[in-house]
Regions:
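Metal-associated gating/positioning segment near the N- to mid-region
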Residues: 46-114, 131
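Alpha-helix-loop-beta-strand connector modules within alpha/beta enzyme cores
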Residues: 101-117, 165-180
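Divalent metal-coordination and catalytic microenvironments
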Residues: 8, 26, 47, 58, ...
Length: 355
């Protein structure tokens, strides 16, 4: 089956130009100023931009969180991505019971029958021991080339600095990229306990108990650990201008340090958490200031931040209202869980449908 896209403006990484594009199966076979193909379905793209399908390198599909689960599965989530022009998503495998290989197999079983587009996977490493150390080198053979560690979420997801160093060192030796969720888990725990004790329960306290300096410090720590492990590092969902500075510093000292930010950190601020519907805007790390937005934009302009992803992780604002899913009415608890306590608000925003 051939498809001929005519009269469009083709956009590549380097330039944009008027041309026709001929596709056969899943491959582009010709780009030229004018193409004729009698056996092709013709799509007239006059006045339209023709872009490659997007890759969203950071999504969470069907993610359990606290008392609920995110509000899409691989069918609804991947369909939303396709409508937005994204044709590949990269989700995360949770490190649950069993081996890493078993966790990966379970994730594929969840995704393969429902995904409407291409997908790939990162592997979370939230528990480290000798068996995990032995398994890490095998991940590329299982199609996994990136792993993620956390410096926050104490007693749940966080690894200690020594464990992160060991993980990075193994990763660097075996062609794996280490992604880091960079916040200071100890400071968050102290400030959260104090806020609740003082009766602070509204959504804005999600940001106030996760100070921006925590992300800056944890990002520098991640870069420093990567330098000592002689391994590449990728800071996910950067939200602080100061994090951009840490990448610049690391690269100036020959550390292969990369970074990602997301639309929510470029267009919204912590002021949105003060709105009546502030729970909608709760994500981790939290939204920051307009000055941080400016710093992130500069990071994009200079190439310090190389990746724009979404950290897609949607929850219903009011999960008490049932929806029709696979022929049945179901209710999935959502942001209303935290109406009296900001720590119970599911952390996450939608985004995979936007590009």
């Amino acid at each position: 089956m051939k498809t001929l896209i005519k009269n469009g403006t083709l956009v590549t990484a380097e330039s944009s130009f008027q041309a026709d594009l001929l596709i056969e199966g899943e491959h582009i076979i010709q780009i030229a100023p004018s193409i004729e193909a009698a056996d092709a379905e013709v799509v007239d793209a006059s006045g339209q931009l023709v872009l490659p399908g997007g890759i969203d390198a950071h999504v969470h599909i069907n993610l359990p969180m606290g008392e609920t689960v995110s509000s899409d599965d691989y069918y609804t989530g991947s369909k939303a991505a396709a409508f937005g022009g994204t044709t590949t998503i990269i989700d995360f495998v949770s490190q649950d019971a069993g081996s890493l290989a078993e966790n990966i197999a379970r994730k594929h079983a969840e995704a393969e029958s429902k995904a409407a587009i291409d997908y790939s996977l990162h592997m979370n490493i939230t528990r480290f021991d000798e068996s995990v150390a032995e398994e890490l080198p095998d991940l590329p053979s299982l199609g996994i080339h990136s792993i993620k560690v956390f410096t926050a979420y104490n007693n749940r997801l966080r690894l200690g600095d020594g464990e992160i160093f060991k993980v990075m060192r193994i990763a660097g030796r075996h062609g794996l990229l280490t992604m880091v969720h960079a916040e200071n888990g100890d400071v968050i725990d102290v400030l959260t306990a104090e806020a609740l004790a003082q009766g602070h329960t509204s959504p804005i306290w999600h940001a106030r108990t996760r100070p921006g300096w925590g992300e800056v410090e944890a990002s520098l720590r991640a870069v420093a650990l990567a330098a000592q492990a002689e391994a590449p590092v990728y800071i996910v969902h950067m939200n602080m201008a100061g994090e951009v500075d840490q990448l610049v510093y690391g690269r100036a000292h020959d550390v292969p340090a990369m970074g990602e930010t997301c639309p929510q950190y470029l267009f919204f601020s912590e002021k949105d958490l003060e709105r009546q519907d502030g729970a909608k805007w709760v994500c981790s790390p939290p939204l920051r200031s307009p000055a941080d937005q400016d710093g992130l934009w500069r990071g994009i302009e200079t190439g310090t931040i190389q990746v724009l992803a979404t950290d897609h992780c949607p929850f219903f604002y009011d999960g008490t209202k049932p929806i029709l899913y696979e022929g049945e009415l179901v209710s999935i608890p959502g942001k209303e869980l935290g109406k009296d306590n900001f720590t119970r608000i599911p952390n996450g925003l939608p985004g995979v449908g936007d590009r």
